[in-house]
Amino acid sequence: DGASIEIRSSDYYEHIITIAGNEGERFGDSLSTTSDGRQIIIGAPLAESNGISNVGKVYIYDRDVQRIQQTVTGNKTFTVEQTPQGRAEVYVNNVYQTNSTYYIGGTYTFTTKTATLATAPLLGDFVEIETNNVQLVDTIEMTNANQSAGFGSTVKICPTNCSVYAGAPTSNQEVPEGGSVTRAVNQSRLYGTITGTVATPTVTSGHKIRINNYVVEFTNTTLAQVVIDINNSNIPNVVASATADNKLTISLINVDAGEVANKLYVLPASSGATPLTDLGLDIFAVVQTITNPYPKDYTNFGHSISVSSDALTLVVGSPTGQSNLEVTLDAGKTTLDSDHTELRDISTQSGVVYTFDYLSSANDSILNPGKLVFGQQVVDTNVDKLSKFGNAVD
């Protein structure tokens, strides 16, 4: 008898969910994700903003993760509040677990909303379950919005997942189509604290938010009860309070104990972004608009963006910009007007790349953030006019 071998194969990628934008916005024209794939930044360069057409917007989405701490000795079952889309993924103390349905010797099974582990975690251990439910966290809009700016034509989140950069290459903020780049920071993640902008807010009883991926449910509508509900959730190193003018503050008890640029998450849960809006929690705050150090009409500064691996250097392409190089004579020995006059070699629309370096402030906070300052221009000395140097940077 001959043996038979059955081979099964499937696509590497499995469709889970579709994120749809508004018609006519060119939603999805640009896209970037955090290093763990849990947040998605999507540009929509033709979106209306503040009543002005075709300004552009940037949307931030989060892929739901729920963290549950082991509080009962021997417990093996952990239930999430949202039904997973596609396969749920399970981690114990940040260690990936394998599903017995798909892997021989797997470490858990999953039914509906409940993960059952083969081995019970120890007391104090935490279990994280990715449900693949994607929800809108925040919308970034352009400061000094102007028509046809193309804001969101290119987007990039830094490698430490705390800063979002959005290019507006056809912005008319300084000169016609001179372009700009906006930097917005996840303020709780970067600084370990966030304060709402709404005084004496009213929330909906039963609505939920996530703090460091722990789900917090509001049991009443008042700010005082929101503070109590958060503090009663016993989230490690997290405390909530009300300011003197009745705004919610969520912060780390010991900020220094938080991981750099990864200190505090404040995110939507099954209720969506509504409770965050009710509390005035603006997760991503715009802190700087960066423009061309050599502004010129139609240079499209911000057409391309890249961020260094340490998140301290921003690289911006201006593919229709003009090179602006100092000309030296006799290896710098000859000067003009006692070195008060410079000669410049300019090539029209040859393309330029600019670097910007991050300088932290003395007391870094959302009210006094560090800034990016111009570093240098990078050009190809052999480039010709209309070469579009800087059309892409990485």
Locate the predicted segments by residue:
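Extracellular interaction modules
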Residues: D1-A3, L117-E128, T243-T249
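Short, contiguous acidic and Ser/Thr-rich linear segments
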Residues: N213-T222
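Extended Gly/Ser/Thr-rich low-complexity repeat segments
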Residues: Q85-V95, L122-V134, G258-G272, V327-G332, ...
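Acidic, small/polar residue-enriched beta-strand/turn segments
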Residues: R183-T197, H207-R210, S241-F284, V327
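Amphipathic, non-transmembrane alpha-helical segments in extracytoplasmic/periplasmic proteins
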Residues: N94, T222-P236
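A general beta-strand register signal
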Residues: Y91, R210-I211
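Conserved beta-strand/short-helix segments
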Residues: D1-V65, N99, L123-G124, N132-A184, ...
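Extended beta-strand solenoid/passenger and fiber regions
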Residues: D64-Y102, K113, A120-N133, V185-N186, ...
